[in-house]
A protein has these predicted regions:
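Long, non-globular targeting/processing and low-complexity regions
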Residues: 1-2, 8-10, 15-200
Length: 200
């Protein structure tokens, strides 16, 4: 492990996504739940590939039911898509399911070429790290609580930008409300291990 930027330790990715847990109480109101949600005539919600991409740029703070739902789908490589959909059925009136962009071919790394699929597959987007399932397990948070409660947010940042920490250091945000910042906690743990290894 090599420190290549101030206060940044290089791992296997250049993203700095973080689960933020605050002391904010309660769930979103029904009106807040609907923010960013559009139901088409068939009462389905379109999940476009371009809206399921969360990388190190641009900087984003995901703090709505809708945006966290998209992140959960993308960051789990689609593993949580069905569970997210069930939660939407519970909270979004008249919701009739997600409709994803589909792919008809994918890259075969053994053959080193694109191959046609027998059947189209949903495109679930992507992230650099695919951390959502690990976060929920590590902090003992259910997917439903993560999506519906105000206290959970996600920061999408890059370690070459560090926009989130520039914002925190500016004094614009009251940091006293932040209980956990997963990326910072992991970085601090790496620093402790690095320091301990150098003592030997």
């Amino acid at each position: 492990m090599i420190q290549i930027r101030d206060n940044t330790f290089e791992t296997n990715s250049s993203s700095s996504h973080s689960l933020i847990i605050t002391d904010f109480d309660g769930k979103y109101t029904p009106e807040e739940m609907m923010k960013g949600i559009y139901l088409w005539e068939d009462k389905e919600t379109r999940m476009y590939e371009s809206n399921l991409e969360f990388y190190r740029s641009p900087f984003s703070l995901l703090a709505t039911f809708e945006s966290k739902s998209r992140y959960a789908i993308a960051s789990s490589q689609g593993h949580l898509a069905d569970e997210v959909e069930k939660i939407w059925h519970k909270y979004i009136p008249n919701f009739n399911g997600f409709k994803f962009d589909m792919k008809t071919e994918e890259y075969d790394y053994d053959k080193k070429e694109w191959v046609d699929l027998d059947e189209p597959k949903p495109i679930y987007g992507g992230t650099d790290d695919y951390q959502i399932e690990g976060w929920l397990k590590s902090y003992n948070v259910s997917l439903e609580d993560f999506l519906t409660m105000r206290r959970y947010m996600v920061v999408c940042d890059g370690d070459e930008y560090r926009e989130w920490y520039h914002i925190l250091d500016s004094g614009l945000v009251d940091k006293s409300h932040i209980i956990h910042d997963s990326e910072r906690e992991v970085a601090e743990e790496w620093k402790r291990k690095f320091a301990k290894e150098n003592e030997k």
